[in-house]
Regions:
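Bimodal "functional hotspot" detector
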Residues: 3-8, 12-13, 17-162
Length: 162
């Protein structure tokens, strides 16, 4: 009985240490929720943490990883499968991203949502001020203070109902 108790005690002490390793260099990726409603309390965009795996300073690598899509089943990729990052340019606080042409498969509204997610991801990685995203003939520029990036619709609804 004492052996069983000692074995049980050892397992209780050591098994919690066997859980997944904490991320050493986490980055935050932003994606649209699979199911959302505009103006809902949860919002349209959510985030997940990913491991930078020694590439914390390699924006091209991290954004290429982003374009593969989310690991969570609750999130979806904002851009069609096969979208690639063609170029990244940093100048002062402005980051310019060039993507493959998505005009045939993404509406303007979907492209704007994708740009908001990609901008939030890029700004969280770089600490920049503004992101310009081009895809074919479309180009969207969003800054850190862009209203598109701020979902305060539930806050104003709550204030109006009081």
């Amino acid at each position: 009985m004492k052996r069983f108790f000692c074995l049980f005690l050892c397992l209780c002490l050591f098994l919690p240490g066997c859980s997944g390793e904490l991320m050493k260099n986490p980055v935050t990726f932003y994606y649209p929720r699979r199911e959302y409603q505009y103006g809902a309390e949860d919002g349209v965009i959510s985030s997940e943490q990913r491991e930078a795996s020694g590439h914390a300073d390699d924006l091209h690598y991290l954004l290429s990883l982003y374009l593969i899509g989310p690991s969570s089943d609750e999130l979806v990729s904002p851009l069609p499968w096969g979208t690639r990052l063609l170029g990244v340019n940093r100048q002062d606080g402005t980051i310019t991203l060039e993507l493959t042409d998505t005009a045939q498969s993404v509406t303007d509204t979907e492209f704007t949502l994708a740009c908001a997610c990609l901008t939030m991801t890029t700004l969280s990685i770089t600490g920049g001020d503004e992101v310009t995203i081009t895809s074919g003939s479309r180009s969207v520029t969003m800054s850190r203070d862009s209203l598109t990036l701020i979902d305060d619709s539930t806050a104003s609804t709550t204030e109006e109902t009081k």
